[in-house]
Amino acid sequence: MTLTAERHDTAQPENAGVFERTDFPTDTAHEQVTFFQDPATGLKAIVAIHDTTLGPALGGTRFYPYADEAAALKDVLRLSRGMTYKSAIAGVDLGGGKAVIIGDPATGKSEALLEAYARFVQTLGGRYITAGDVGTNSDDLDVMGRATDYVVGRNTSAGGSGDSAPMTALGVFQGMRAAAQAKWGTASLAGRTVGVEGTGKVGYQLIKLLLADGASVVATDVNAAALDRVARDFPEVKIASSVIGQELDVYAPCAMGATLTDESVAAITAQVICGAANNQLAHPAVEHDLGERGITWVPDYVANGGGLIQVAGERLGTSADDVRAQVEKIFATVVQILDVAKRDGILAGAAADAVAEARIAAAR
C-alpha cells in the first residue's frame, strides 16, 4: 500500500505493526511513504520519498534487523529527510529518499528477495532511485538491476560507476581543507596532525590524501584487519587504540555515527572536526558545546557528499572528470557555510541547512 503525508484514516490499535496500520502521521512533510511486502521471499520494505523538488528522490537501501517495524519507519523517515538536504547541498539535481528492508542480511538476504524488492521500486516509476547502504553492496545492486531501471552504484562490469570510497574521501579532504583555511588561514594540512577514526574503504583513501598533503596521521579502527592494512601500506601512520584524547589538529570520524558525545567533546584536543561518518552528533546540543570550545565542525552530510555526487553522476551520465570536479567544489561549499555561520552568528549545522533550503526554495 502507498500512504502519503496527507492521508490519515481511522485510528488503529497502538500495538498494530506498521504493515497492519492504515493511518499515518501528517507532520513528517514527506511526499510519499510506501510499504512493500512479498510473503514468498519474506520481504518487508519501506520506501520514503521526502522531497522531489530538485529531481527524483535518490537514497540507498538499508538492510537491517530492526527491533520492530516502528523503528524501521522512524529510521527511513529520518534518513530520507537527510538525503534531501544532502542532495541539495551537493548541488545535484536530485531529491531525497531512502529505503529499508527489515531483516538480517546475513540470514535473510537472497536474490529472490532483492529482485522482489526491485520490482516494487520499478512500480514507483522513477520517483525513487535506490543505491547501496548498510547491509547492501554493489553485488546486491547488480541483482536489483535485473528488475528495475532505477538503481545506481552497481559494479563497473554491470555498467555502474564502481566503488564510491575514493570520491567520498576526496570530498571529506576538501571539506577539511576548507575548515583548515577558516581556522588557520591556509588550506594546506602540511604539518598538521589528523586523527582518522575508521580505516575502512573511505578512511583508507582519506589517509592517502592526507599523507600526500604532508599531514601526520594517527589512525584507529575496531577492525584489526583494516588497521593492519594501514600499518602495512603506510608505515608512517601512528596506530592507536583511540584517537580521541590524542594531541590532534583535526579529528576525522569515518566509522560509526554518534562519536561526538558530551564526554568525547570534552576530551577532544582537535580544533577542526571533519569526517565521513553519518550522524556524528550524539544529540544536537553537542554542536553547541563544540562552538563553545571554538572547534570548527564540518556538518557530516556536507563533507561526505562525494559518494552521492558519484552515483548521481552515474544516473545523469556525468563523466568521471566532471564528477571529480564537482566533488572538489565541496571546498567552496564548506567555505560558504562557515562564512554564513560567522556572519549570522549561527552554528555550522544551521548554516548548512539554510544553504540547502535556499537551493530547494529557489527551485520551487
UniProtKB/Swiss-Prot annotation:
Transmembrane segments: none annotated. Pfam families: ELFV_dehydrog, ELFV_dehydrog_N. NAD(+) binds at R62, D133, S164, T168, A255, M256, A276, A277, N278. It catalyses: L-phenylalanine + NAD(+) + H2O = 3-phenylpyruvate + NH4(+) + NADH + H(+). It is an enzyme of class 1 (oxidoreductase). Keywords: NAD, Nucleotide-binding, Oxidoreductase. InterPro entries: Aminoacid_DH-like_N_sf, Glu/Leu/Phe/Val/Trp_DH, Glu/Leu/Phe/Val/Trp_DH_C, Glu/Leu/Phe/Val/Trp_DH_dimer, Glu/Leu/Phe/Val_DH_AS, Glu/Phe/Leu/Val/Trp_DH_bac/arc, NAD(P)-bd_dom_sf. The active site is at K98. CDD domains: NAD_bind_Leu_Phe_Val_DH. SMART domains: ELFV_dehydrog. Has been used to resolve racemic mixtures of D,L-amino acids to yield enantiomerically pure isomers for pharmacological and peptide research uses. GO terms for molecular function: L-leucine dehydrogenase activity; nucleotide binding; phenylalanine dehydrogenase activity. One of its GO terms (biological process) is L-phenylalanine biosynthetic process. SUPFAM superfamilies: Aminoacid dehydrogenase-like, N-terminal domain, NAD(P)-binding Rossmann-fold domains. L-phenylalanine binds at K86, N278. Pathway: Amino-acid biosynthesis; L-phenylalanine biosynthesis; L-phenylalanine from phenylpyruvate (PDH route): step 1/1. Its EC number is 1.4.1.20. Belongs to the Glu/Leu/Phe/Val dehydrogenases family. Catalyzes the reversible NAD(+)-dependent oxidative deamination of L-phenylalanine to phenylpyruvate. PANTHER family: LEUCINE DEHYDROGENASE, VALINE DEHYDROGENASE. This is Phenylalanine dehydrogenase.
